[in-house]
Swiss-Prot record:
Record's keyword annotation contains Transmembrane: no
Signal sequence bounds: none
Pfam families xref list: ROK
Protein name stated in the entry: N-acetyl-D-glucosamine kinase
The protein's annotated pathway: Cell wall biogenesis; peptidoglycan recycling
Amino acid sequence: MYYGFDIGGTKIALGVFDSTRRLQWEKRVPTPHTSYSAFLDAVCELVAEADQRLGVKGSVGIGIPGMPETEDGTLYAANVPAASGKPLRADLSARLDRDVRLDNDANCFALSEAWDDEFTQYPLVMGLILGTGVGGGLVLNGKPITGQSYITGEFGHMRLPVDALTLMGFDFPLRRCGCGQMGCIENYLSGRGFAWLYQHYYDQSLQAPEIIALWEQGDEQAHAHVERYLDLLAVCLGNILTIVDPDLLVIGGGLSNFTAITTQLAERLPRHLLPVARAPRIERARHGDAGGMRGAAFLHLTD
């Protein structure tokens, strides 16, 4: 059995998957914030419960936001302060008496989709998350590409390209990102960015679902906004796809529920790619909230 943990600032979710990659059991508990020992206890207790329920000693994979293992072997995860700065992988491996694998949660999302029965035919899979922020991951031949700093796929921290400014206007405001840089594309393409763009152009403060509802009702202003957003997304993805050239692009996160993104993006991409380039197949993520657990569990399938 393969145990996959999706750990975030509010919850620890465990999913248990069998050899056919089917979910057999899952459980969620709140993420402890009081101490590192309480955090370790929460993870270990879930593993013990799974072992007992299923009568096996399953392998353990963990997806967590941030850098799973820095040069000194410690975790960097600002959203999980109880464990950040601690040697999480080594400590859990010792307590659980088994190999524990860690990776960035966005890489786990991409790995989950790459191992979907429909998608295993594609050698290079790019996962793109359009949620609170913008992130993603790359999977080559069933294995995540992490890079030495675990930042492969941090697409949201690429800067706006020149073509984006041509589209939006050279007086378009470059917003400061939480990473400290100016003009990171997640400030414009995330769910928050989608809403910010609407407020910038129309001086109305609406959340993304409200804007999408107006678009579905045929509102002209919402229609113009969505057209602009899709063009901006295509411009930015054109740069990324020219570098990565994936066979498949899978889009997840809250905005992936907006069908116009997956249905209309393909027709806008070619003008931003090299003439000889082929646009990837574009699909919405298949596994929703279970994707993080699936991908973490499948870290043990990548040998």
